[in-house]
Structure formats: structure tokens, C-alpha cells
Amino acid sequence: MHLVQTQSLNAGAPIGQPLLPIDYVPIFADPYITIQPFTKPSKTYDYWEEVIDLLLPVLNERGIKIVQIGGQNENKLPACVHYQGLTSIAQTNYLIKNSLLHLGADSWAAHAAGVFNVPIVCLYSNNKVSNVYPFWGNKTKQKLLTGVEPGTLPSYAME
């Protein structure tokens, strides 16, 4: 059961469409995709620079920039327009909502992209995807990648 369904059941409340706060922020790259590569250590993927190296030729050919979002202490990835630590949650929502695609690790930003029906490519590590996938949005626009084989249980990090 998805965590949203569990919370709804426990609260005795129906599931509705979330209304996320949105505040304007100037965008210095357009068109663009968003990337939030970092999250808690058990969900961190170590090869984002290689991913960007693979994506850049295709994105550059189409004039698409990469906007990195996240916390101020997170590493800056190469070839990105850096917004991490410079925006509020509402401003980050604005960036996600207006992007062509959201790419990242399992985090709140992937769920926000789902709410805004922005296409998603998201990496999952230690959570069972069927319990935590972006609940809202068109599922045909969501590519959820996991190293876990179908039908098996994920390994859980000790944090």
C-alpha cells in the first residue's frame, strides 16, 4: 500500500489533489530540466556527473539547460545552472512546475513534479517503490528506476 493511502486510511480522510505553494523566481535558463541529485545518504547515487555527461550532447543540441535544485551545502554538478540553497520551497516548486522534466533521487521534489504532472526520471535505492512512488501525475510520464529486481524486497540501509 502506498504511504499516501496508508495516511488517508489512518486519518479517515479522503485523498485529494495537493495544493503546493508556488512563488515566482527568475529563471536564467529556458527551456530547462530540473535535477535534485542529493538526498539522505542511503538514497545517494554516486554517478550523477556521468549521467550529465551522457545527457549534455542531447540537451545542448536542443538548447535545454539543467537547473540544479537542493540544499546550499550540496555539491554543485558541472554544466548546471545552480539554484540550490537560493530558493524557498515555494520557489523551488515554481522551478519544478515550469521544467520540461525532473530528474533526481527519491525525494520531495519528485513528488512535487508528480503533483505538477511534470515528467519524472527518479532513482530509488532502499525503499519499496510501490510504497513511495510519486502518487500524483500521469504514470506514463514517470520512469522510476531501481536496482531491485521485480518481485524481490529492497535492501534497507542502517541509518
Question: Each PLM stretch: what is its role?
Answer:
Residues 1-159:
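Catalytic machinery of carbohydrate-active enzymes
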